[in-house]
């Protein structure tokens, strides 16, 4: 099993546990050059709130989407949008990535902006 298969296995197990708990899910999608986050409803089919470094207004404000500073802004923005939609309690789905760097920065910013997980 290589590194990517291990990450995908961890992500799958996390999503199964979150689905069994019937919780709203804050999912993080990380690439080499961008980061995005989405809050899904408990059924897992409806996106309640989303934010990404690929959004037009954010691309102009953020020089590079692959830094922790960009992740902080995305975390804050997705939390504000989720709270506005009435979602406060979420389960954090880090997509199998380590809780470190950009993932950690996004999570801490989301907590500071009002999400609880």
Curated annotation (Swiss-Prot):
One of its GO terms (cellular component) is cytosolic large ribosomal subunit. Pfam families: Ribosomal_L18p. This is one of the proteins that bind and probably mediate the attachment of the 5S RNA into the large ribosomal subunit, where it forms part of the central protuberance. The lineage of its organism: Bacteria, Pseudomonadati, Pseudomonadota, Betaproteobacteria, Burkholderiales. InterPro entries: Ribosomal_uL18_bac-type, Ribosomal_uL18_bac/euk. Part of the 50S ribosomal subunit; part of the 5S rRNA/L5/L18/L25 subcomplex. Contacts the 5S and 23S rRNAs. The gene is rplR. SUPFAM superfamilies: Translational machinery components. It comes from the Bacteria. GO terms for biological process: translation. Belongs to the universal ribosomal protein uL18 family. Gene3D superfamilies: 3.30.420.100. Keywords: Ribonucleoprotein, Ribosomal protein, RNA-binding, rRNA-binding. This is Large ribosomal subunit protein uL18. One of its GO terms (molecular function) is structural constituent of ribosome.
């Amino acid at each position: 099993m290589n590194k990517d298969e291990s990450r995908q296995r961890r992500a799958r197990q996390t999503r199964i546990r979150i689905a069994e708990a019937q919780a709203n899910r804050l999912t993080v999608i990380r690439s080499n050059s961008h980061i995005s986050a989405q809050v899904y409803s408990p059924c897992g089919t409806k996106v309640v709130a989303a934010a990404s470094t690929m959004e037009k207004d954010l691309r102009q404000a953020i020089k590079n989407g692959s830094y922790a500073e960009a992740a902080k802004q995305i975390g804050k923005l997705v939390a504000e949008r989720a709270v506005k939609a009435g979602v406060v309690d979420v389960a954090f789905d880090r997509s199998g990535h380590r809780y470190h760097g950009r993932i950690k920065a996004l999570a801490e910013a989301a907590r500071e902006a009002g999400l609880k997980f």
